[in-house]
UniProtKB/Swiss-Prot annotation:
Its EC number is 3.4.21.89. It comes from the Eukaryota. It is found in: Endoplasmic reticulum membrane. Component of the signal peptidase complex (SPC) composed of a catalytic subunit SEC11 and three accessory subunits SPC1, SPC2 and SPC3. The complex induces a local thinning of the ER membrane which is used to measure the length of the signal peptide (SP) h-region of protein substrates. This ensures the selectivity of the complex towards h-regions shorter than 18-20 amino acids. SPC associates with the translocon complex. The lineage of its organism: Eukaryota, Fungi, Dikarya, Ascomycota, Pezizomycotina. Belongs to the peptidase S26B family. The gene is SEC11. This is Signal peptidase complex catalytic subunit SEC11. The chain crosses the membrane at residues 15-35. Catalytic component of the signal peptidase complex (SPC) which catalyzes the cleavage of N-terminal signal sequences from nascent proteins as they are translocated into the lumen of the endoplasmic reticulum. Specifically cleaves N-terminal signal peptides that contain a hydrophobic alpha-helix (h-region) shorter than 18-20 amino acids. GO terms for biological process: protein targeting to ER; signal peptide processing. The C-terminal short (CTS) helix is essential for catalytic activity. It may be accommodated as a transmembrane helix in the thinned membrane environment of the complex, similarly to the signal peptide in the complex substrates. The active site is at residues 49, 90, 115.
């Protein structure tokens, strides 16, 4: 089983194959980011605040190409709050004004109150520039893998270790 590591050329080939897989995944992610004009074109729903529309673990696909187009009330958007690095998936419930400077108020479908408490200090509303993207499609429950990996770090280490071993010990 470990005899394949004895040949330096074969070990180098397997290492390069592993690097190729990682770089291809990275290029696909960056390509999707450019195509959707979103820094995070795919997000996972982390809480139950959007039930019944979206469940925890749903994988959402975002589109941000319509940055000049008006954002409408009822649209489900993903936004980042200044100073926080966790994207929030909520629905626009009120809109004040028009154009890129319109003030937007969001709320989770399963929440009793709007999101003003979630916004950054001295921020009462969102603007279009705060929005990462609008939800255009989703796949139910697929994102549970990432939730499990973030809630149980040992699973991430084990999974990466197994994948690395499979690549290194693979015979052609």
């Amino acid at each position: 089983m470990l005899s394949s590591l004895g040949n330096p050329r074969q070990a180098a080939t397997q290492l390069l194959n592993f690097a190729l897989i990682l770089s291809t995944a990275f290029m696909m992610w960056k390509g999707l980011s450019v195509a959707t004009d979103s820094p995070s074109p795919i997000v996972v729903v982390l809480s139950g605040s959007m039930e019944p529309a979206f469940q925890r673990g749903d994988l959402l696909f975002l589109w941000n190409r319509n940055i000049v187009q008006e954002t409408d009330v009822g649209e489900i958007v993903v936004y980042n709050v200044k100073g926080k690095d966790i994207p929030i998936v909520h629905r626009i419930v009120r809109k004040f004004g028009a154009g890129p400077k319109a003030k937007l108020l969001t709320k989770g479908d399963n929440n009793a109150a709007d999101d003003t408490e979630l916004y950054a200090k001295d921020q009462d509303y969102l603007e279009r520039k705060d929005i990462i993207g609008s939800v255009v499609a989703y796949i139910p429950f697929v994102g549970y893998v990432t939730i499990m990996l973030s809630e149980h770090p040992w699973m991430k280490t084990a999974m990466l270790g197994i994948m690395g071993l499979m690549v290194v010990l693979q015979r052609e």
